Design a protein with these regions (language model features):
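Central cavity-lining transmembrane alpha-helices of secondary-active solute carriers
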Residues: 47-73, 93, 151-157
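Glycine-rich segments within core transmembrane alpha-helices of 12-TM secondary carriers
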Residues: 57-59, 139-169
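Cytoplasmic membrane-interface "Motif A"-like loop-to-helix N-cap segments
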Residues: 71-87
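Cytoplasmic helix-loop-helix junction between adjacent transmembrane helices
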Residues: 112-148
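C-terminal membrane-cytosol helix-exit motif in multi-pass small-molecule transporters
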Residues: 160, 164, 168, 190-205
Length: 205
């Protein structure tokens, strides 16, 4: 068995950076989906049922992706990175399109796709740390992941506030549709998700 080499601070930084995008997208979803459902006409008693996507997709997708990513090898991207990329592409597209949903069923379907896509990226990204780092550096790797998770969550929470209070966007649209600040927030989240995952893919071996 080959001995794993110790990595530098910046190499570990690069490995964990993708979680910034993952948590940015996840945080936008968690903070805004109920409002999106309400804008589309969902009643308060329907919203808990519409939120079933997150736990259900986690239960289904995580073990499947974990199994597959353990056994997948791409000649260019390697073991886990194909899943980083596939999940990031689908999650980013879904984030951008989500605020343009025209009906509750459409937003609910988008949420299922988004949660599945996030899980496709997230589970292999977690496992990547254990694949690459020696045991003595694992705690440092997981700490770095937690750091980027925290940063992503903060950015997701601040983005709508920034657009409303600093940029001066309107909180309510004139036609009663999903407001522009939500659309811009999800656009930034989608771009950030893909950019962060691409950074990790291309800066790590």
């Amino acid at each position: 068995m080959n001995k794993k080499e110790e990595l530098s601070f910046w190499q570990i930084w690069n490995m964990a950076f993708g979680f910034l995008g993952i948590q940015f997208g996840w945080g936008l979803q968690m903070g805004n989906m109920s409002a999106i459902y309400e804008f589309l006409g969902a009643s308060p008693d329907q919203i808990p049922l519409l939120w079933l996507a997150a736990p259900m997709t986690g239960l289904i997708v995580q073990p499947i992706i974990g199994y597959l990513s353990d056994r997948t090898w791409h000649p260019v991207l390697g073991r886990r990175k194909p899943y980083f990329l596939i999940g990031a592409i689908f999650a980013s597209i879904t984030l951008v399109l989500m605020p343009y949903s025209s009906a509750v069923w459409m937003a609910a379907g988008m949420l299922w796709i988004l949660d599945a896509s996030i899980n496709i990226s997230m589970e292999p990204t977690r496992a990547f740390i254990a694949d690459i780092l020696p045991e003595k550096q694992l705690s440092r790797g997981y700490t770095m992941q937690s750091f980027f998770i925290g940063i992503g969550a903060v950015l997701a929470a601040l983005m709508p506030w920034f657009l409303l209070n600093v940029i001066g966007m309107e909180k309510i649209s004139s036609d009663g549709s999903i407001p522009d600040y939500v659309k811009v927030s999800f656009l930034v989240g989608g771009v950030s998700f893909l950019a962060a995952m691409l950074y990790t893919i291309f800066t790590t071996k």
